[in-house]
Amino acid sequence: MSLAAGLSAAESGTPPAGKNPTADGYDGIWYTSRGYYSGGFALFPSQHSPFAVYRGEVQKTFFVYGGTVRGKRQLQAMVSYYDHQRGVVPRPTIVHDWGESNLKPGQMADGHRNPTLVVDGDGRVWVFVSGHGDNGYVYRARKPYCVESFDRVIETPMTYPNPWWIPNRGLFLFFTKYDHSRESFWLTCPDGMSLADLATWHTPGELNAWTISPDGDKYGHGNYQFTAARGSRVATAMNNWIGRTRDRSNLFYLQSDDLGRTWQTADGKPFSVPIRTAHCAALIRDFWSEQLQVYIQHLTFDSQGRPAILFLTASAGQAAEGPGGPKTWTVAHWTGERWAFHPVTTSLNNFDCGSLYAEDDGTWRIIGSTLRGPQPWKTGGEIALWTSHDQGATWKMLKQLTAGSLYNHSYVRQPVDAHPDFYALWADGDGDKPSPSRLYFCNRAGDVRILPQAMTGSFAQPESAAAWSSSKSASRPGSG
């Protein structure tokens, strides 16, 4: 049974016949927030996950991203897949078009409204379209392993959706609501759940209950959560906003092995949710006492199922972009006895982002925008591949994946159960001004390919990014 059991065409929010429209190529959204961050944000923000899922039974990597209408700043939730047998991608499917909403023009390009996805036990693709302090949407594919047509399942207040499929147990969804501040919740939907049951979103579990206190509690402005799943375990790493500034700091971790009925810290000790104060057993490290900001990038598990968190630190009060102190990429790893902290490298922007891989043979990798790009100090840069062979204690840059780029590359995302041929996905975009945005992926060795921006047929083969750069260097699209 799948999540979709019990759904009828009449219960869904879209007509029962026909296919969703498609685009004639892969164009990412360009987005900015008051100069705080800007660029090609098709895979933004870091607290959205997952963006891609590999399913071996059909040898396809399904993925979503924030697309756009070429020449406009109009966000569309897109879904597609990479066919590993044929080495091709289809035209991407438009699942949700924010241009058809009643949002203000500036909100129609808001990268916070990007989608995430999950593939259920029957192979149906579910797309979770984020709101931003308002309603989001959930869509499900009509056919297993097919992204041609979707039905809307529900509309509900939902920001930063993180859906995870737990084998033989169902869906676990982390998400955020902006009731008082940024408050984190979870929701479970076992196999066979009907729409009527799925609609009981008014009683989700609550992970934190920070509120803005009258006395200006410096920790009381909510949090961001970054999640992962392995087997029956779900986990969340969190930071929190500090006072009425834009600083965010501290590092928290919680996990559950029973779909949220009980929660534990990394050492297995019970923890009663929600978190109500920063100084609690879930706090890994009080970075604010060290006057450091914390920007979490990715949460994963090592080969023994122990959590590892990739994050960046910057001096308190320091602007996200521009000259200043170092932005230090750091790995926090639970060794089984304690949290160990290991620096990796430094970069130029608080919102630089990568993915952490802890492989079964003991190799750890980071793929991310750690190198200076063509728009220095802006979000992203050039992409590099780093490796560690001592559980993240020391790191070496193995390979630079992009170089001489026209735009910064940003938000490198790891697929669930990543196939070696489709190991990371990201986008580029001008960090200074609106521009076109292309989508890229690489294999485990770091060879980069670019998704086609213009398609004349139903399928196309992604080009080598190096070959594309050489052939298009004289005719690259300018800023729009």
Regions found by a protein language model. Give the residues of each.
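Bacterial N-terminal signal peptides
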Residues: 1-4
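Extracellular, repeat-based ectodomains that mediate carbohydrate processing or recognition
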Residues: 12-472, 476
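Cleavable N-terminal signal peptides
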Residues: 7-8
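Short, solvent-exposed mixed-charge patches
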Residues: 478-480
